[in-house]
Amino acid sequence: MWNELRIRLRDLAAVRIRYGYRRLHVLLRREGWKVNHKLVWRLYREEGLSIRTKGRKKKISRLRVVLPQAKAPNERWSMDFVSDGLFTSRRFRVFTLVDHFTRESPAIVVDHSIPGSKVVEVLDHLAGLGIKPQVITVDNGPEFSGRVLDEWAHRKGLKLDFIRPGKPVENAYIESFNGKLREECLNLHWFKTIEEAKEKIEAWRKDYNEHRPHSALNDQTPSEFAENFDLSRAVEKAGF
């Protein structure tokens, strides 16, 4: 049994390159392996699977920022941009969205240029599908602080919550999501074309939503957490 477990652990680690032993342990449990995290840690070390990480810089002590807490899906989202480059060195941008409560990413857009009008187009498409937040946390970038998005938000009856300039910690949910995107996708691929970048980044978004266990969600995936929340709310409304 242990040899089979060792082989399966190696296989998972080969696919989930940036997953540590704790998240790999969750995946093994999901597959039916009845093993504790200590055994997985021992095999993980014996197989030399430890992730190489950069040494963390010592941070200056600062006051902890208390972020607004969402209590249901679509109460509060965050959105932001990430930059990367093709194999040819041509730059492209990634427009990211994340739900604070479920940690789901409702959409991700990749292109060489993403103006405010494109941001509105994406949000309007989601709203047409019945997916619309009450509040969106954003920075003060021109795509978010311009008139196009402001007018759209007013028409749709939602609030834009701008963080203070130079305070990305106030947008921690999207910063965390962007970090995972870079570590688990952008840093692992050479994109030859913008089409390839779109395909691989969208595939990562779907995998993140549907298959990636999230520690803040009690090791559920974002999609599982959202589905279970909707189910429990439906049961409450039915009076059971």
Stretch-by-stretch model annotation:
Residues K34-V98, E104, S117-H125, L129-P133, ...:
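Mobile-element integrase/transposase regions
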Residues I108-V109:
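Short hydrophobic alpha-helix segments
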Residues I51, K159-L160:
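Hydrophobic beta-strand scaffold residues
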Residues V138-P142, G146-E151, L160-R182, T193-E202, ...:
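RNase H-like two-metal-ion nuclease catalytic core shared by retroviral integrases
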Residues G20, I114-G116, N140:
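Conserved catalytic and ligand/cofactor-coordination microenvironments
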Residues M1-R76, P142, K167, T221-D230:
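Basic, flexible linker segments flanking DNA-binding modules
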Residues K156, G179-F240:
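C-terminal domain-tail junction helix/linker
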Residues L9, L24, V40, D80, ...:
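Mobile genetic element proteins and their domesticated derivatives, centered on retroelements
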